[in-house]
Amino acid sequence: MAREEGEQQESMAEWLIDVLGEPSAVRNPLVHEPRRTRELSDLLLSYEYGCFLLESKTLGIFDRIDIPDRSALRKGVLRHVNKAANQLAGACANIRRGLRITDKAGQDITVNRDWPIHCIILVPELSLIADCDELIPKLALSLLGNSKAFLNLVDLSELHNLVYNAGSIASKSQKLTRLMAFDGILLKRCELASHHKTPDFRFRMTVADDK
């Protein structure tokens, strides 16, 4: 059941990211390290102005005999978020090292390695960690300083809102694609998150119509 829970959340994330248009996201890409080949991230999307890495974390509550209380769920989410941040830091390092990256069939994936990387951690529900006011600034500063990457912590509802926001911005622009708008939205959201008192916030960006 936990595997199904994780697969479902990853599939929803992949579907939402693919709404942004071409190129499509790659599910469970592989990085070929000198000693072994392993998964780079849950999702990878690269385009001409950068790339996005997404790690999806679930709680596996359907495998448990007793439903945990919110305090236990909070601890579980925090543990998974820290694990995801470490995984993303490693993925960023492998991208910067120029290691070969492929899909599961062994086909090479062209990855933009020159621009800062957008790292997304997808959790089941942001409200579970609403009181963790130091979480995002700490993790975001670490990723930015060590990996030249921007971090956004979202749940499916917020990811849906951000994708919809990107489509709305792109529809009012002659120059911006949905992917470009999504890139800009994540950048501004990451900047705002470092000044926010809680990871549980909703973000929407507006721009002037240039048509």
What does each model-identified segment do?
Residues 1-40, 45-211:
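Intrinsically disordered, low-complexity Ser/Thr/Pro/Gly-rich regulatory segments
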